[in-house]
């Protein structure tokens, strides 16, 4: 029995593993590659130079690999890469990259992408990310591992959001959010650290307390940012168990091109 519905249109040049399921009325373009165990629901369009890994589930009416919503795009063969075990719900749109960046949009593995999410051109997403309904990423946004974006969160182009960071419902993000930090509001401002998420991921009480001290140095000490970075380094040198996380926080701030939320 074929796993491709009789009404689906799969280009003969597309490369689909024999275990891939394709639902009714879906369209798969000629430059698409889909690995074993992935399920493409009904009424899905997968186009462009798109590679989809193993055991992904894509629900109805998603648009995967369409041209960037960028007027500079002139049809170049840019790419979209999707890893393994992702869930992509209804009406999600994920666009190809552009030649103005790295030529590729990337989605890692084990991500949960809820309905109506938009992931624009050249976005780079890590692993174990949750994007709640209607979250919108503008072009060139980078999300590190374990990020959680609340529903209707919007992220300005070129912003970075650090590992384990979280946004509240309707947050409007216009600057970088450091790792572990929770942000809320329009414009988004810091609102503590993502303690509950860290507990669920096995961080110890001592590590969470050290991260909280790092947060207070940045956001509650009234120190200029350069002095806060020096104080973070001193805290890092005192906290052997949490030093990698404090270093992660400090390095993110030092390399932030847009500046962090304050």
From Swiss-Prot:
Subcellular location as annotated: Cytoplasm
Main subcellular location of this protein, as a coarse class: cytoplasm
Class of enzymatic activity (EC top level): transferase
Keywords for this protein: Acyltransferase, Cytoplasm, Lipid A biosynthesis, Lipid biosynthesis, Lipid metabolism, Repeat, Transferase
The keyword Cytoplasm belongs to this UniProt entry's keyword annotation: yes
GO cellular component: cytoplasm; membrane
GO molecular-function term, one example from the UniProt record: acyl-[acyl-carrier-protein]-UDP-N-acetylglucosamine O-acyltransferase activity
InterPro entries referenced in this protein's UniProt entry, alphabetically: Acetyltransf_C, Acetyltransf_C_sf, Hexapep, Lipid_A_LpxA, Trimer_LpxA-like_sf
Catalytic reactions of this protein: a (3R)-hydroxyacyl-[ACP] + UDP-N-acetyl-alpha-D-glucosamine = a UDP-3-O-[(3R)-3-hydroxyacyl]-N-acetyl-alpha-D-glucosamine + holo-[ACP]
Alphabetized NCBIfam families for the sequence: lipid_A_lpxA, PRK05289.1
Functional description taken from the UniProt entry: Involved in the biosynthesis of lipid A, a phosphorylated glycolipid that anchors the lipopolysaccharide to the outer membrane of the cell.
Family: Belongs to the transferase hexapeptide repeat family. LpxA subfamily.
Protein name, per record: Acyl-[acyl-carrier-protein]--UDP-N-acetylglucosamine O-acyltransferase
Organism whose genome encodes this protein: Herminiimonas arsenicoxydans
Taxonomic lineage of the native organism: Bacteria, Pseudomonadati, Pseudomonadota, Betaproteobacteria, Burkholderiales
